[in-house]
């Protein structure tokens, strides 16, 4: 299992490195080319964790006008030029042993330190998903349809969604949307199953997530047209009854007010 969290960069070597790079890139000539009046310099510090902090990798990326040109990877142990623009800086910094030693030490000083800070909040955060099933169109027996299993509002992003028909896993005709970010540190995904409705079929959406002790199982049953008609008739009769009840109460209330007068 691996994870990545953003670095909180302390004042020190990496901040100083930014200043040096800005001075170099702001010079009139860089690698034999005129430097534009306006340019964008970016620095990205990344920490990768494998099995907690048993193995930690730190990567520093230097980006000029949206193109990475220089990189320090703790697994490599030295600076490497990604483009010709980064070669002079890589050669210069690799010749300074004190710089290399400090960069190698950043893995412990920054990555492992920040992991301990984030572990109790971001890394251990769990939000259980909500799972619902709905057909993409009105049910019709012996016709193709699409069942949509909506898995929403979960964190972290890793989730496993499976479709079953009468207890047997369905793999053909399964399509999933990309993972969707909700913008509040939760995610959602839609997993669709193309099927031919048959009376009595039972479809199950099974969801596994790290926030759950047991998988969530949501069932959906195909209904016959007569059953749907009966259900709609029952709902219609219930609504009509409520209307007449309300009308009767209203008339009675008006009559009582007339008697009081």
UniProtKB/Swiss-Prot annotation:
Q: Where in the cell is it found?
A: Membrane
Query: In Gene Ontology terms, what is a biological process of this protein?
Result: peptide antigen assembly with MHC class II protein complex
A single Gene Ontology CC annotation of this entry is:
late endosome membrane
Entry annotated with the keyword Transmembrane: yes
Residue ranges occupied by any Ig-like C1-type domain in the UniProt entry: 129-233
Q: Using the UniProt annotation, give all residue ranges assigned to the region (Beta-1).
A: 32-126
SMART domains of this UniProt entry?
Answer: IGc1, MHC_II_beta
A Pfam short name: C1-set
Extracellular side: which ranges?
32-230
Q: How does it sit in the membrane?
A: Single-pass type I membrane protein
What are the annotated disulfide bridges?
47-111, 149-205
Glycosylation is annotated at: 51
Lineage top rank: taxon: Eukaryota
Where does the record place the region Connecting peptide? 221-230
Provide the alphabetized UniProt keywords.
Answer: Adaptive immunity, Disulfide bond, Glycoprotein, Immunity, Membrane, MHC II, Signal, Transmembrane, Transmembrane helix
Q: Where would you find the membrane-spanning parts of this chain?
A: 231-251
Q: Where is this region: Beta-2?
A: 127-220
**Cytoplasmic topology: which positions?**
252-261
Query: Could you confirm whether the keyword DNA damage appears in this record?
Result: no
Alphabetical list of PANTHER family matching this protein: HLA CLASS II HISTOCOMPATIBILITY ANTIGEN, DQ BETA 1 CHAIN, MHC CLASS II-RELATED
The similarity annotation says: Belongs to the MHC class II family.
| UniProt-recorded name of the protein | SLA class II histocompatibility antigen, DQ haplotype C beta chain
Question: From what organism does this protein derive?
Answer: Sus scrofa (Pig)
């Amino acid at each position: 299992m691996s994870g990545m969290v953003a670095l909180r960069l302390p004042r020190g070597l990496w901040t100083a490195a930014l200043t040096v790079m800005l001075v170099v890139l702001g010079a009139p000539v860089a690698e034999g080319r005129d430097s534009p009046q306006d340019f964008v310099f970016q620095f990205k510090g990344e920490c990768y964790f494998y099995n907690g902090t048993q193995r930690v990798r730190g990567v520093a990326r230097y980006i000029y006008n949206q193109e990475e040109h220089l990189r320090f990877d703790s697994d490599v142990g030295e600076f490497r030029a990604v483009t010709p623009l980064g070669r002079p800086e890589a050669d210069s910094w690799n010749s300074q042993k004190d710089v290399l030693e400090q960069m190698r030490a950043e893995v412990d000083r920054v990555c492992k330190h920040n992991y301990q800070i984030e572990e109790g909040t971001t890394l251990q955060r769990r939000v259980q998903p909500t799972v619902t099933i709905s057909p993409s169109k009105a049910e019709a027996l012996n016709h193709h349809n699409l069942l949509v299993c909506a898995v929403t509002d979960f964190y972290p992003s890793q989730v496993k969604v499976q479709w079953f028909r009468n207890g047997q896993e369905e793999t053909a005709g399964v399509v999933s949307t990309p993972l969707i970010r909700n913008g509040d540190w939760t995610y959602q995904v839609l997993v669709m199953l193309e099927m031919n409705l048959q009376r009595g079929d039972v479809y199950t959406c099974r969801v596994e997530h790290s926030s759950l002790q047991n998988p969530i199982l949501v069932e959906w049953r195909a209904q016959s047209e007569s059953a749907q008609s009966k259900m709609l008739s029952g709902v219609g009769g219930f609504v009509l009854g409520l209307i007449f009840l309300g009308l009767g109460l209203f008339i009675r209330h008006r009559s009582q007010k007339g008697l009081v007068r």
